[in-house]
Amino acid sequence: MATEPHAALAELIRTHRQATLAVVEAGQPYTAMVSYVEAPDLSGILIHLSSLSAHKRMLLGNPVCSLLICEPDDGRAEVMSLARVNVQGRAALIERAGADYPQAKARFLAKLPSAALMFSLPD
């Protein structure tokens, strides 16, 4: 793949804030809209999930997941020409008491300051 498409995908990941998270439970697919923050080097993606959410429960049972990041529909005739990237991987929980939590929280709030309320909730 040429450098130009890599740069376009990196820009797509860095400039968007929401994506579709896909998880599997008991062989059944489930999707949810989530907000995310990317690692500076794009080596990982942070998603803040409530313990009350079905998708967090599903990820704790089966961490295999994918994240679809897509540019917004702008009304163009060929909808399939919208830029998109699908990231596949395994989710890992960052515990509130863990050493990585303060930095992860700071990165998340730097991009999504409106999430401060979510971080203040006990779940």
Indicate residue ranges for each PLM-predicted region.
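Binding-site signature for planar aromatic cofactors or substrates
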Residues: 1-123
